[in-house]
Regions:
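Bacterial N-terminal signal peptides that target proteins for export
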Residues: 1-7
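Short, charged beta->alpha transition segments
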Residues: 6, 131-134
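C-terminal motif of bacterial Sec signal peptides marking the signal peptidase cleavage site
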Residues: 14-17
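Beta-rich carbohydrate-recognition and catalytic domains
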Residues: 21-25, 29-73, 81-129, 137-295, ...
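Hydrophobic, well-ordered secondary-structure elements that form the walls
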Residues: 356
Length: 400
């Protein structure tokens, strides 16, 4: 959790009382109205070919389930990859977004380009820690998973949660090695990216104090490198790394800002733009996206164009959120760059943390999580409520 539970609820009370006329619910039925994975109506965005519920939290509305063994009511933190000719999918399940050991990761495989998924592995949290934020990467023909483990502590800005990034690997996606620490105490690894045989991740310090680049040559042993962004007053955290065609490294730094700005409903919405050139020994951060705070971002290229899926903040709506598709334009090798909002996926409440896998040069499978769409709760209330994992196929050739 990014804030104390009591603080969250206190902040939520004025938000839910706000006029939310500007954030009408999206036109998808509540996922408990049918089987998980059933097709649902979606907003009329031309690039979204289909969308459906893949993991149904509404079917597990029981506060006393053993989430280390079964799917529970709050499902989140997705990722996708392709491995051995199949699409692989991972997500977290728990009772809520609150930190705790009653949580697990579920790993699935699809051999029909994401139409259906079969569970291949269940990876419960350590007995005294929470687990979350999984991401796939591959080393020497094996599938690897990075995740974050934290103590079950309620604190502001993830302070004193003693984050430890852990890793595990598998030759087949079914049989996994034991979880082992791959990062130092107090640092959260975001997504892992590979470039010329070297693995990179941006790590943010507990308390959301700074972001530092880490590198590895084997995906297991990681070494701290240069700072990416160190202005702790901006509350920097999840930082998505993207290698550009010309070799520049882009870091998009989520900045939650001041106490009043943490929930994204008032004040500034900003994402810091940081750059590094080979051999990536220093970063400069000359610009920022003003008006867009990209929470939990995932970037991907499609036919030379750079896209991002991230949480979108709808200010003035009582704290409502969406998962949105953006495109980054401009000079992609060092800037300046700009951001274009292409529209929203079916989403509401606690939402985003998407995964992306290419199906063909213009079609991509996307996963994300969302609260009940017709209910359209605020983000804060959604953190404690039911969430489903959605999947959709997007056609980026429709974006002209």
């Amino acid at each position: 959790m990014k804030f104390r539970c009591a603080l969250l609820l206190a902040l939520a009370l004025p938000l839910v009382a706000c006029d939310a006329d500007n954030a009408a619910p999206l036109s998808a039925p509540s996922p408990d109205a049918g089987d998980a994975g059933a097709d649902a109506p979606v907003e009329t965005v031309p690039w979204l070919e289909s969308a459906s519920v893949q993991v149904n939290g509404h079917a597990a509305n029981d506060l006393y389930l053993d989430c280390r063994d079964v799917i529970c009511r709050h499902n989140e933190n997705t990722d996708l990859t392709t491995f051995q000719g199949a699409v692989w999918f991972v997500h977290r399940t728990a009772i809520s977004q609150t930190l705790g050991p009653n949580s697990a990761l579920h790993v699935y495989r699809s051999t029909d380009q994401g139409v259906t998924f079969t569970q291949m592995a269940l990876l419960p949290a350590p007995t005294t820690r929470d687990i979350r934020d999984p991401c796939f990467y591959q080393v020497n023909g094996e599938l690897y998973l990075k995740a974050l483990t934290r103590l079950p502590v309620d604190s502001s800005r993830d302070s004193n949660v003693d984050t430890v990034a852990v890793g595990m690997h598998s030759p087949d996606g079914i049989n996994w090695s034991a979880m082992e620490p791959i990062g130092p105490h107090g640092w959260s690894f975001w997504r892992v990216k590979e470039q010329n045989g070297v693995y990179y991740t941006a790590a943010y310090q507990d308390g959301d104090l700074q972001v530092v680049l880490y590198t590895s040559t084997d995906g297991v042993t990681w070494t701290a490198g240069p700072p990416i962004y160190t202005v702790s007053a901006d509350t920097p955290l999840e930082t998505e790394l993207t290698f550009m065609p010309g070799g520049m490294l882009l870091g998009l730094v989520r900045m939650d800002g001041t106490d009043d700005e943490l929930l994204g409903d008032e004040g500034r919405l900003r994402t810091k733009i940081c750059w590094s050139s080979p051999p990536y020994t220093s970063f400069s951060c000359p610009d920022e996206f003003d008006g867009e705070r990209l929470d939990g971002p995932v970037t991907f290229f499609a036919q030379g164009r750079l896209f991002v899926v991230a949480r979108q903040h709808l200010q003035g709506t009582g704290g409502k959120k969406r998962t949105a598709l953006y495109e980054i334009t401009g000079e992609l090798d060092g800037g300046p760059i700009y951001i274009n909002d292409w529209g929203q996926f079916p989403s509401a409440g606690d939402t985003s943390y998407a995964g992306v896998a290419m199906l063909d040069p213009s079609h991509f499978l996307v996963t994300w999580y969302s609260g009940d769409i017709p209910l359209d709760q605020s983000w804060v209330l959604g953190m404690f409520n039911l969430t489903d994992i959605w999947k959709g196929t997007i056609d980026l050739s429709k974006l002209q």
